[in-house]
Structures are given as structure tokens and as C-alpha cells.
Amino acid sequence: MNQPLKTSVKAPSHNGNQPIRVLQHNIIHQYENTNATFLKSSKELVDKMGLQPGITYFVYDEAIQFSNEHFGSQTPFVDGNKKIAIHETFLSYIWVMCYSMWVLYDEAVAKPMQNVQAGKEINKINKDLISSAQELLKYGKSLIKVFTPWDKQNLPNPEEFSTDEEFYIFRANGLFTMAINFILCHEFAHVEKEHIDQIMLRPVGSQERKVFEKEADDRAIELMLQGKNGKNDKSIDLGILIGLCSMLYFSESTSGGKHHPDTDVRIVNFLDQINPSNDDPIWGIAGLFFKIWDDQFNLNFVWPTQINDFKELFYNTLKQVEDKKKKS
């Protein structure tokens, strides 16, 4: 069977090597419009605290764990000169997370559950879509350690797609800009909270660095939530969640190392702040992140066959994460 014709949305202004390049302008637009006063605040930070305008965009066809004289890995950072930097491979990774997790939750979790509740098939499950999302997720996770080019012909991507693929591609694009925006706001907060000044002035110990990171998370969350307008609320919430949960696949441990709080602690801190209802899909997506993490590293978590809601499942999983930490 012939595949539907794919059309490229690449324009001459899209610089870079990977398909994620087509969302460069979306990233900047969302960042500048984080909330009604953000652009004014960022200009004040440039004038008064030395934030460097613009964002450095590194283009290296290398894995996320690649390092050189400019950075220790291809994850976002703000440097000693207060310039925020992002990397093309990391952006690709985050888009993959946004697409795969939304498709897998919608097609492999939510729709089957609705069918069971209705006692009949009210939703047709697209198994091909699930399969392609799983393949894409496998590719995305591989980028942590090994770089290979994105197979635009066979894997979903934001640059070349058919009209049949538009629904989930566009949804992923929206989630992606929110996820990256949370990460950019986190780096922005490090400048605003004078963390960079402190680190450049004096030795800052591990515990204080973790306090800095929590403060940056909290400020980034605050900035993002101030941008809610009734239409983008769910996208903002899910974007922040994906930005945090995507860190799970780097290690079988949720440890944040010497500088960051543990990943599970950061996720719970965010969910506590937005306090979703028990049946909010965000609990199911958070649980799905942990289920795939469990499968990836063979952690042997126990997954109950009957639950009241996804919030219960999430906290059941979280307890197993905490128990694992106590034993290690």
C-alpha cells in the first residue's frame, strides 16, 4: 500500500539540520509571549541584570551526551555571560516525547479505556499510529547516547508529513513549544533570581545549587501559569509536565545528581502546584512516562490491574520510586 504523500513545511529561514528546525520561530514567539508582561520583564532583565538578548542555537549532529569546549552536554543552559543556549538534538528529543506520549496516551490508554467503560467500541484504535509512535519514541531515546538522522519518510516529524498526520503533528507542535518554553523560563529564572551572579562570585555547594534549581522551577512554573487564557491551559500544564518527565529516560535513577533535585520530586512539586482533578488526563500521561521508564530499565514495578483513577496509579508508582531510592 502506498504511503500518503508527505509535504515539507521547511522555509529558507529555518536554519539547522534536523526536522525540528521548522519550529525555531514558534519557540521564540512562545517565549516572548509567555505571559502578558514577560517581554517587558525580559527587557528589564537585559538592561538591569545583564541577560544577553537572544538565544544561542547550537547545531551539532551529535548525541545529547556529546560535549565540547562550549558545554558539558547538549542540554539547555545559561552561561556565565547570562546567555541562554539550546541544542538542536535536545529539541528533537523533546518533540519526540511530546508526539509519542500524546499519541500513546490517546490511542493506547484513553480510547481503549473509554471503550471498556462504554461496553462497546465507541473509539476505533489506530494500531499503525501506536506502532509508529513507539518507533519514534525508540528513536528519540536513542538520541541521548547516539546520534542518527531522523527518518523523515517513515517516522512522524514536524517538517514533512501528510494531511493524515496533521492532527497529532500539530498537537505535538503545540505541546513542544510549551515544553521548551518551560525550560527556557527555567534558565531565565536563574538570571532573574541572581543564581548566575552567585555562582560566578563564590563557591556554591551542592545543597544550595539544588535550592537554586527548585527556585528556577517554581519561577518558570509561575511565569507559564500566568500565560493561561482559558484556551491554552491544558497545553501549558502538559508542556511543563513533559519538560520535567523527559529527564527520566537519561538514567534508571531519578537522582538529580549534585545540582538538581530528583526528577520525581520536581514532577510532584509541579503537580502539587496545579492540583489537577483526579480524572485529569495529566495523571495518566505522567503515569505513562513512568511505565515506559520502568520498561526501559527493567525496574520491575508492580502495576495494578484495577485502579480508581490515574492519580491513584501515579502515587502508587511514586511510592515504588521512593522505596527504590531508599534501597539504593
Residue ranges of each PLM-predicted region?
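Serine/threonine-rich low-complexity intrinsically disordered regions
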Residues: Q52, V59-D61, N126, N157, ...
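Long, well-structured alpha-helical subdomains associated
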Residues: L225-S328
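Peri-catalytic and regulatory segments of divalent metal-dependent proteins
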Residues: P4-N181, F188, K193-D197
